[in-house]
Amino acid sequence: MWSPRIVALCLLAAFGTQYALASAELPFGFPITAHFPFLLDSYENKREYVSYSIFRASSACPLPMTAAKNTSHSQSTILQKQQITSSSTASVTNLATLNSYQAVEDIKYFIQQQNKASGETNPKWIVYGGYYGGSLALWFRQQYPGLSVGAVASSAPALAALDFYRYQKNVEDAYQAYDQSCYNNLASAVTEVRHLIQSVKGRKKLSDTLRLSPAFDKLSLVESDFQFFYVVLLSFLQYPVQFNKVNWGPFSTSGGIADVCKLLKDNSVKDLDKVKNIVSYMIGLGGGDFSNSNLPNNYTQLVGWLADESNGGQMRNFLWQQCNELGFFTTTDYGSGGLFGSSIPNNFWINVCEDVFGKSFDVDNLKAGVKKSKSTYGASSTYTGKNAFIVRNMVDPWRTLGHITVSDPTSSIYNASGSAFTADLQPPSNNDVVSVKMARNLINRRIKQWISGSNNKRAYESNHIAEEKKTSKDMQGEIKASSWETEINWHEKLPTEFEKVPHPKTPYIPNIKKRHNLLDVFKHKMGDELYQKERVKVSEKAGSGFIRSGSIKQNVDHFDSKNNDVYRQFFMLNDQYDDGSQLVFLMIGGEAPIDPFFIGSEYIAMVQWGAEYGALLLELEHRFYGRSQPTEDLSVPNLKYLHSEQALADAAVFINKVNKDRNYTTPRWIAFGGSYPGSLSAWIRLKYPSLIYASIASSAPVQAKTDYFEYMQTVQNSTRAFGTKTCMSDVHKFFAWAQQQMTTVAGRNGMATLFGLCNKWDTDYIDPKDAEFFLGMFVYQIAGTVQYDDEGHSRLQKRCKWFEQVDQYLGAYTKQISFTGDDTEEHQQIVKQFSTGLQQMLWGSVRAGDEDDCFPFSYQIILDELRQDTPYYTDERCWIWQTCNELGVAQSTNFGYNIFESTLPVNHFMDLCYDVYGKDRDYVDAHVRATNADYGGQDYYNGTQVVFVNGSEDPWNPLSVYNPKDKSVSSFLIDGSSHCEDMFILGDYDTKAVKKAHRAIKKILKSWVSA
């Protein structure tokens, strides 16, 4: 009779028994199964699904036995193997219960049933596994600690991730760490491939050399074709790293980093042939023959195979889990420093999910699944369970998604240097590195401790780190004492119109990440004529002395007692309505100079309410914008002082000084702000509640997020909802045409001529960043229109008509030009005729024919502009720094099929962070996490007495607060309204939704004022 005292439960998690922990749990990737026959045999022929494997503690790991609920078993064999017959299909309906939550419950049920069957009163179960099985072991241990005494996990990606860009970067870093010259040769070979793929003759060379099937000239050459090519190619570089020196299959003695580097360092071989040799070597490693093989090069075939419910095998099953809860998609979304640029954005994998499982399996479904996973198992890199031993194999690219610290001293993490994917769980080998042997010894030691019940803390090597805490405590005590000892000047000269007037030859800088200026909102809303009239009125108020400017001495650093540098921060005030009640309305400045308009125009809601309630109106300029410059220049070392925490401390010191200077004893300050200043108004109430009584946060994106694809997703949704009937198709038609033109020299050159670019793009290779930023300019046009759309959506519909006209124009051009030879006079005349008309439509003038009047557009020009570190030169340098250093908000098109194609990968923005400031994606991600930990983000905002107001059309609304934690916090989403609409007074043109929200906001404001 089977009655074990100690049981080890190995979690193989739905993969073939033949390959135990390592083989079948490969990350999703078509190429590896296409070229390793022994894997393909497992997927296609055996069709054997194994959920869990039971091993006796004293055994030498016999073949595992499958466990399944409600399956009869004998005393001699716990559970028999269950073969999945060909009639069982992996349909979406059948896959509905394939998820980690069900798997954890299966483990629970299995253990309970075995305990019951064995009659043991004190069984000691140890759960262990590698890769996803390791994650299950850790999750089960967290969820049901009473059913096991410990867990062992190796190479366990326990943290769900929408975009696992770090996998590929870890691969590249591994080659560089092994041998710099190997890495340099790899970089050279990759560069050659990226150059060749841009031209017809280059693609033919790639097709012939790498035996692509089908060849590029047989494909329609849409973005997914190029992306899939790179997915295939990268797999041959990834697996030598993932399985480096792992005692499994062919990798036990070959196929590692050293073997690939040997091929790369053969300088007698040309770059492309080095790539071919690596592909040939890896295929041969799996028993194949490259000379008789064809490299798959057809995205349509891939998704067709995976969509076949009876054919996709385990890859279809695990893809299901990736698309629904785990993510784990390996991309090149790292930014500068990655060898493959933006070749595989997360867009590719989201499209795969939709194409394989259906349109409902989109980015929203994936995002919700990843969020649920993090909510269930934890989003922190700190493991909170007890009695767990986690092995991080430091060559394994998956290590980044594993836990790196523990919160309980009975758990430990061992960083196995030089070790790769689940190496410690494989049979011992002479090829094992020292750390693998050590890992096995430590595992044995831990298991003995768990079995003996020796849980004293001294028995463990602890990596204890406390969880990050969300805070809402008053921050006054953290500002250094000298900051409060300040001076204020109430009589500074008012500036003239401060906005920079660009020189006619200044290159176009895209409004990257949509730097906000409330003046732009007003101009769009009310029109230039009314705006100019209002400016005259505001100037008259300033002339009569109601509106004045002042300054306050502020510390450059409010938190470093060793830094005594100070600067002048400017503010403006309007005391026209001040009735002496000590009520103050503070308009917080943001990423633009302050302007008397915001405290002087009666079209601004705060001004109207200030007049009604007798408030003093103040406006405080944000450090590093306008005249408030803390440092001599905008160099990166100085930009560290440009931070929201420093800005909030500025405001706190300012409020305190005003209270003292005006002898306020019972002041009541209410903060206002829109967009980023809206976030500041919410955060200042969170951090300094004793100084700020309440806040109104308009269009406030309080959630920091690196890849903010929801921005462009909202632009698309708003275009669908409020644009013309054909707007979606017209916009998509333009970008599809533009992407197609970029695939050939003639197409690129034709576009450059049509649009009047100085660079004619007439070479086989162009910098992909030039094309990316050029097309991005058109994305920004429609995005900016949506962000600042009017209530009737006439601005958006006008922009839609513009795209419709451009499409018609380009269609006529393409039709006419197809009947002429490239070098004929007739051809040149048609190009000139159409380029003249098109440039009139785009720029309002003709910018071709004269070199001095062409359009100076390139990525390098943009970098040169943004690298200028002279104050007053550009607010863009400061704002983009804030996004790289705190906020993220990269407005990518990484949300699956969309009207913009894959025009703006997240690297579009990550490259700027690196190329302008030297900050890579790891830096950006870490600082985004810090921002959310500091302020709580949208889900854990703990402030009180705040009103959040957003418009459903506004692309920034997804980052605001909608489920407040405190009943004193209100949230309004105004249907059909866009950015900061609520900050203006009501007019006849306003919709019912806007009027209703305005009344509700004013009611809350009145309660604060009269309390």
Stretch-by-stretch model annotation:
Residues 2-83, 90, 97, 420, ...:
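Catalytic-loop region of hydrolases
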Residues 72, 77-81, 157, 419, ...:
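Short beta-to-alpha linker loops that shape the active-site pocket of alpha/beta-hydrolase fold enzymes
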Residues 95-115, 639-659:
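Alpha/beta-hydrolase active-site loop
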Residues 81-93, 162, 624-637, 982:
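Glycine-rich "HGGG/HGxG" loop immediately N-terminal to the catalytic nucleophile
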Residues 146-264, 690-808:
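A catalytic-pocket lid/entrance helix-loop region that shapes and gates access to the active site
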Residues 119-131, 664-675:
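Alpha/beta-hydrolase fold nucleophile elbow
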Residues 226-477, 770-1011:
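C-terminal subdomain of alpha/beta-hydrolase-fold enzymes, centered on the catalytic histidine
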